[in-house]
Each structure stands twice: as structure tokens, then as C-alpha cells.
A protein has these predicted regions:
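Long, positively charged amphipathic alpha-helical accessory segments at protein N-termini or as interdomain linkers
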Residues: 2-25, 35-121
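Conserved active-site carboxylates
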Residues: 32
């Protein structure tokens, strides 16, 4: 059921960003992450049917190195939080590894690990 992935995606990204950058990052359901009520990440997902198979497409936008003073939206960035330039490649690799760990555990255990994960959320 792909609907659960909205929760999983938000929780996984929040966990990664909170651990690495600030524990003040919070989830705003269903698809945003906020830092002090300012948007730092947006998550979109869509299911697609192709040749009788269903696929999930997930788009993740993380504000990394922009200056929030130049934005007309209530947003912030990881650079603004940390006062450091963010290496986008390293951040992407970190996110990818965390997704791989979660999905490997889920696949290895017939998705029982994923079910446990969603129950914790």
C-alpha cells in the first residue's frame, strides 16, 4: 500500500535531517518538514500504473544553500540553520543509504520490518 509511504518518507527524511542538522526539524503533515515554522523540505509522491504494474514516484525538495531573505515564502535552508555550505552530493548519498537500509530490511523480512517501522510512527 503506497499510501503508507507518505508517512515513511516524511519520517525518514525528518530523522536524517534532525540527526545531521537540527533536532528542531518537525513534520507538517502530510508532506512538509519545517524548522521553526519555516519550510525546509517538501515531499511529493505519485503512483503510476504501467504495463499492469504499479510504481511509486517520490520527489524530494530540500532547501540546502539558498538565502531565505531572498524568498517571498516562509522558508529556510540547511545553510541558514548551520551557517555552513551544504554538500548536496553528500546529503543525497546519505538519504539514499538510509532508504536502501530501510528497503533492504523490509524486503529481507517480507516487509515485516517496514510494518514495524510504520507502527512506530
Amino acid at each position: 500500500d503506497f499510501k503508507k509511504f507518505a508517512i515513511i518518507n516524511a519520517y525518514l527524511l525528518k530523522s536524517i535531517l534532525a540527526k545531521k542538522f537540527s533536532n528542531k526539524i518537525k513534520i507538517k503533515w502530510p508532506n512538509d518538514l519545517l524548522f521553526k515554522k519555516k519550510k525546509i523540505c517538501g515531499i511529493l509522491q505519485e503512483t503510476v500504473n504501467n504495463a499492469g504494474k504499479q510504481f511509486l514516484i517520490v520527489g524530494i525538495g530540500i532547501n540546502t544553500n539558498f538565502d531565505p531573505k531572498n524568498s517571498s515564502f516562509s522558508a529556510t535552508s540547511l545553510k541558514h540553520i548551520t551557517n555552513k555550505n551544504i554538500d548536496n552530493k553528500k546529503l543525497l548519498i546519505m538519504i539514499k543509504k538510509n532508504y536502501e537500509k530501510l528497503l533492504f530490511k523490509a524486503n529481507k523480512n517480507s516487509f515485516s520490518e517496514l510494518k514495524k517501522f510504520t507502527r512506530k510512527i
